């Protein structure tokens, strides 16, 4: 609070960026409770103090382009979703080179996460002419490159990073909850 940043930059995979989204809300509204933050599409207006930039280093959650954040309470084993277009980052930096150092287990897990998001966007009851092309292209890209990416093909790893972002743009606008 004393520092007063006008930009918050989150770098990492889904969990660090999701945590930074929650911290951004707390920075803008110090008195907001976690329960209030969890009210679906009930966030207060953000960007009064700071804008938000997300730099993704993994290829799965696409949180850098979505209106969602998942905060996990590991002690209770509960995942709390935050959902509001207010927490969509202002700037997303999707540099495929950042994903090239992911361990293969993470490549597999995040790749399946991206595929799930793309399929979910396509079959969503809120899909539309804008979300379907993004979802279908992401599905095609993931189908063609996930195994190659897992096997160390860096061009495929780059493609996966872009595909997960397309899937994120699709599901953030077609909404979630089916798959």
Give the positions of each predicted feature.
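Short, intrinsically disordered, charge-balanced linker/junction segments flanking boundaries
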Residues: 1-2, 169-179
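Glycine/threonine-rich beta-strand-loop-alpha-helix active-site module
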Residues: 2-97
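Gly/Ser/Thr-rich helix-start
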Residues: 13-15, 61-63, 112, 169, ...
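Carboxylate- and glycine-rich phosphate/diphosphate-binding segment that chelates Mg2+/Mn2+
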Residues: 68-174
């Amino acid at each position: 609070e004393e520092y007063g940043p006008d930009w918050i930059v989150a770098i990492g995979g889904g969990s660090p960026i999701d945590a930074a989204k929650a911290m951004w809300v707390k920075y803008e509204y110090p008195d907001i409770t976690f329960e209030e933050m969890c009210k679906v599409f009930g966030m207060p207006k953000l960007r009064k103090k700071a804008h938000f930039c997300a730099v993704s280093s993994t290829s799965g959650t696409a949180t850098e382009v979505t209106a969602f954040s998942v905060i996990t309470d590991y002690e209770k084993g509960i995942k709390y979703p935050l959902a509001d277009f207010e927490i969509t980052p202002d700037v997303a930096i999707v540099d495929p080179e950042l994903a090239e150092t992911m361990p293969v287990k993470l490549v597999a897990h995040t790749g399946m996460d991206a595929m799930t998001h793309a399929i979910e966007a396509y079959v969503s009851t809120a899909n539309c002419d804008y979300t379907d092309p993004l979802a279908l292209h992401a599905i095609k890209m993931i189908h063609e490159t996930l195994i190659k990416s897992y096997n160390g093909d860096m061009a495929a790893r780059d493609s996966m990073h872009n595909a997960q972002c397309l899937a994120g743009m699709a599901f953030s606008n077609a909404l979630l909850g089916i798959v």
